[in-house]
Amino acid sequence: MAFDKKLLEIVACPVCKGKLEFNKEAQQLICKADKLAYPINDGIPVLLENKAEPLAE
């Protein structure tokens, strides 16, 4: 199942409530403010802080 980019209009980072960007190659939603990457599993974003991975600097 593919991620529906229309979801980007309504989802937000659960930590800072900021915008998320879609990384198609890694299948992640990225919060640049918090430097976190949220996984997308089977087209469903997992927006849980404890599942996020820190972005490499």
UniProtKB/Swiss-Prot annotation:
Family: Belongs to the UPF0434 family.
Any matching Pfam family: Trm112p
InterPro entries: Trm112-like (IPR005651)
SUPFAM superfamilies in the record: Trm112p-like
Protein name from the UniProt record: UPF0434 protein Spea_1772
Alphabetical list of HAMAP family matching this protein: UPF0434
Cellular component GO terms, alphabetical: cytosol
